[in-house]
């Protein structure tokens, strides 16, 4: 059973929010669905009164306007749960990080030395060190960035690595309950609680 936060629709708004409690990304009605993995999942919320329900596992794309260039960027979110009643999308931070996407959720005003990569999502574009940085905003304590539903034509004409980037991987199968995550973390901690150096 997957766990996601409950989220109501807010007319006229579309955005993608970071959700540290969601073990899998969730796409709402303002994402363009491009693939059905035919792998339904049982989803539960945080309230005991919420009945678990079966939802589809899909791949989808959201659009984002890069404020530094004004260009439209398309972000593929693979192996996500489709919840069409939701206006916004939820981004499971762990799932993004497993695709080597850097997520910094510390607000800039809380950082001792903020940079462009503070409170931002950063995607490495190639081996020359160039990056796409998506700055995050706050509503209350929720980190988010504005997104929109792209047209089929815009998605099909976008060139991967130039206008299209993947926030999560399409394969292997995403399993948020995989014990390897806990084992890998345990192997990085000494019995005294200190971190194990990488070259130890």
Report residues per predicted region.
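Aspartyl protease active-site motif detector
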Residues: 2-47, 78-92
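Accessible peptide chain termini
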Residues: 1-2, 200
């Amino acid at each position: 059973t997957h766990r996601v936060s409950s989220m109501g629709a807010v007319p006229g708004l579309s955005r993608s929010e970071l959700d540290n409690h969601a073990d899998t990304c969730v796409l709402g009605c303002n994402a363009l669905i491009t693939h059905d993995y035919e792998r339904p999942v049982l989803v539960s919320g945080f309230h005991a009164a919420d009945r678990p329900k079966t939802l589809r596992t899909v791949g989808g794309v959201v659009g984002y306007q890069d404020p530094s260039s004004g260009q439209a960027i398309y972000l593929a979110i693979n192996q996500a749960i489709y919840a069409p009643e939701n206006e916004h999308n939820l981004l499971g931070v762990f799932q993004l990080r497993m695709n080597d996407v850097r997520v910094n959720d510390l607000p800039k005003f809380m950082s001792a030395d903020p940079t462009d990569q503070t409170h931002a999502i950063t995607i490495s574009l190639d081996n020359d060190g160039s990056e796409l940085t998506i700055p995050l905003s706050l509503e209350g304590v929720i980190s988010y960035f504005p997104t929109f539903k792209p047209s089929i034509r815009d998605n099909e004409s976008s060139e991967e690595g130039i206008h299209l980037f993947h926030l999560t991987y399409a394969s292997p199968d995403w399993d948020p309950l995989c014990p390897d995550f806990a084992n890998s973390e345990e192997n990085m901690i000494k019995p005294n609680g200190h971190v194990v150096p990488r070259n130890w």
